[in-house]
Design a protein with these regions (language model features):
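Rossmann-fold NAD(P)H-dependent dehydrogenase/reductase core
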Residues: 2-226, 308-314
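Alpha-helical packing segments of well-folded alpha/beta enzyme cores
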Residues: 60, 191, 251-254, 299, ...
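Charge-dense, low-complexity polyampholytic segments
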Residues: 73-77, 268-281, 311-316
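A short C-terminal helix-loop "cap" of Rossmann-like NAD(P)-dependent dehydrogenase/epimerase domains
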Residues: 172, 227-239
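C-terminal amphipathic/interface module of NAD(P)-dependent oxidoreductases
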Residues: 287-316
Length: 316
């Protein structure tokens, strides 16, 4: 009796084909999201850039097409900071099914004062977490129509040292930009893991995976005309950082693997291999601050109340 050939090791430079698949990348016009889109486009997948800025989306698509002959890439207007606008995204996609969504769009503020979305939510929590929570709700019919869709949540290494304050999710009492950012990304990661628990309990074919890019710097990122320009000064200044960190092209690798690799399972956490900061994508143990399912369930309930929608409402 012959045995199946061993699965070859994952190679970020020789990705499997994904012809016929449709993937939405929020914030796909810049940064890590751009490189997620570029790398997925090279597999033959149809990649949709979710962007609030049409001009930047056009530049990103032009860059991808220049590097990937025959790339199937287009854009939809998408602003995760505007909850009401997300209702129309599924229709705007113009597809019968969605094989994956990469929840990548986000905002990080370095300095006070505290800012809010048009819906009255703290800007980072509202954009990074609540927007993607609500978007998932509206995308669920398309995701459920695919044979084995994946929801990929882009977390952050900045979340690893944080704890959620469930009584101050909007940072009204304690607003420190870096802490608030880390907590917003932690909320996102809790969502991704809790969503998978609910998907599994309902017997859904959709899986939810959490990833993070490690330490991904602009100064270590290759140039893409119209999207990102790397100067000689930036290259020189970034040399010491390259020992521990990486560019945003490499920060995209965990998300790309989570979309494409059949060995990746829902409820897993993936990040860079070397200390969680750089290198090839690999599976990590779920962080200790993500292990409390009671916290995750309470966050889910709060998110449902704040957005008025529930991504798991129609499961089962």
């Amino acid at each position: 009796m012959s045995s199946a050939p061993p699965t070859p090791p994952w190679n970020v430079r020789r990705l499997p084909r994904a012809d016929g698949s449709v993937v939405l990348v929020t914030g796909g016009n810049a940064g890590i999201g751009y490189f997620v889109a570029e790398q997925l486009a090279a597999t033959g997948a149809t990649v949709v850039l979710g962007s609030r800025n049409p001009a930047k989306a056009e530049n990103a698509m032009a860059s991808i097409r220049a590097r990937v002959p025959g790339a199937q890439v287009r854009a939809v207007r998408l602003d995760v900071a505007d909850l009401a606008s997300l209702r129309t995204v599924a229709d705007a996609l113009g597809v019968e099914r969605l094989d994956a969504v990469v929840h990548n769009a986000g905002v990080a503020l370095d300095d006070p004062p505290r800012q809010e979305t048009g819906d009255g939510h703290e800007l980072m929590f509202g954009t990074n977490h609540l927007g993607h929570f609500a978007l998932t709700h509206w995308l669920m019919p398309l995701l459920s129509a695919a044979p084995a869709a994946r929801v990929i949540t882009m977390g952050s290494f900045a979340a690893k040292s944080e704890r959620l304050d469930l009584d101050d999710l909007q940072s009204r009492r304690d607003y420190r930009p870096k802490r608030t950012y880390g907590r917003s990304k932690l909320a996102q990661m809790h969502f991704g893991l809790e969503f998978d628990r609910r998907l599994r309990a309902a017997g859904s074919t959709v899986a939810s995976v959490v990833v993070h890019p490690g330490g991904a710097l602009d100064s270590l990122t290759p140039s893409r005309p119209g999207v990102h320009t790397k100067t000689a000064a930036a290259r020189l200044g970034a040399a010491p950082a390259a020992l521990l960190l990486q560019g945003k092209h490499a920060g995209a690798w965990p998300a790309v693997r989570a979309v494409l690799d059949p060995a990746v399972r829902g409820g897993q956490l993936w990040g860079p291999r070397a200390f969680g900061l750089r290198g090839e994508p690999h599976r990590e143990p779920v962080w200790a601050n993500l292990a409390d399912t009671t916290v995750a369930a309470r966050l889910w309930d709060a998110s449902r109340d704040l957005t008025g929608v529930d991504p798991a409402a129609h499961l089962g």
